[in-house]
């Protein structure tokens, strides 16, 4: 085995881990929804879509055996994580500033009309308001945790893209 193969194998293992982390985060969201009765708002559902996209791209990238394919999927992961950062930051700003709204009247029908909301309504149907502040976990609101998660994923994937940029030429 050469360094190229070892690096690709290590990268694929990390991508598998990222995929499983996304599954765990989505399972945590379902736990909060069904056990703690914390209904998801439109921005919560959009964040779930971003975590799903990151997980799917991570699992697909873990199955690819060349750097170019891994690079393309890691780029898609970075784009999804950046979208998640923006959505979570907006959600957090709404919760930190009472009186603001996420535009439930306009956002809810759009989110609920997406195909996954029809296929998996228990996971992707809007049931709450963005202004509803649920009890913080370790002093941080839920959108804050999502923001931290998306930011960590974004930084890690961008660092990986930067670190392995020379392997694309090979």
Swiss-Prot record:
Residues 1-14, 65-71, 164-170 are cytoplasmic. This is Disulfide bond formation protein B. The gene is dsbB. Its main location: membrane. Disulfide bonds join 41-44, 102-130. GO terms for biological process: protein folding. GO terms for cellular component: plasma membrane. The chain crosses the membrane at residues 15-31, 50-64, 72-89, 145-163. It holds the Pfam family DsbB. It comes from the Bacteria. It is found in: Cell inner membrane.
